[in-house]
Amino acid sequence: MTDTQQPELTEDGRQRRTIKSFVMRAGRMTEGQQRGLDKGWPLFGLELEDGLRDFDQVFGRSAPRTFEIGFGMGHSTLEMAAAAPEQDFIGVEVHKPGVGALLNGVMAHNLSNVRVYSCDALEVLQGCVADASLDRVLLFFPDPWHKSRHHKRRIVQPAFAELVRRKLKIGGVLHMATDWENYAEHMLEVMNAAPGYRNLAADGTYVPRPEERPVTKFERRGERLGHGVWDLKFQRQE
């Protein structure tokens, strides 16, 4: 899934300067994706400029709330939202074709529990999401930036962990997944050292793939080729 922009943050999670953890890609819009933007955005799109939001008011109810960083083409978001109509989902993605694809799917499935931002997810967390208001934060298959000189671009850093911790409710969970073992090790190192979290893995490493995380076509292909996927779950304790 597509990563987000990585601002360099201070220890308390405030933005210092911008480091990109994604590369903007030009891409054609399909008819369905364009329809999603044209017709779906006025119904389900949210703007960063609107600032702090009361999501109970946005969704018209109080329900368990999931925030997904970088939903790519939106397949997993759509599957999760359709399977859990009692929950609300806020998805953030910078690439317009993916935004259009998700919105088109939301309309096709007649879903009312999805809202979408098309901008930097960390700016949304900082400026639009109240502290202690999220039940889950999802980060599935972010850009691994596998070259050592690019590791600073990885979104999972100590300040990211602190920002997410502030936005999660006590007992809320950060769920990450990656198919790069080195990035999984990096995630584990950062999160095990992050204050205020508990690793939900029994052995303090990785959890088995949770049933609620959809399996993507890329993951299935990787499994056929013998590639691994690592899931991490960390729960806010304080």
Swiss-Prot record:
Catalyzes the formation of N(7)-methylguanine at position 46 (m7G46) in tRNA. The lineage of its organism: Bacteria, Pseudomonadati, Pseudomonadota, Gammaproteobacteria, Pseudomonadales. GO terms for cellular component: tRNA methyltransferase complex. S-adenosyl-L-methionine binds at residues 68, 93, 120, 143. Substrate binds at residues 147, 179, 216-219. It holds the Pfam family Methyltransf_4. Belongs to the class I-like SAM-binding methyltransferase superfamily. TrmB family. Keywords: Methyltransferase, S-adenosyl-L-methionine, Transferase, tRNA processing. It catalyses: guanosine(46) in tRNA + S-adenosyl-L-methionine = N(7)-methylguanosine(46) in tRNA + S-adenosyl-L-homocysteine. The active site is at 143. GO terms for molecular function: tRNA (guanine(46)-N7)-methyltransferase activity. The gene is trmB. It comes from the Bacteria. Pathway: tRNA modification; N(7)-methylguanine-tRNA biosynthesis. CDD domains: AdoMet_MTases. This is tRNA (guanine-N(7)-)-methyltransferase. Its EC number is 2.1.1.33.
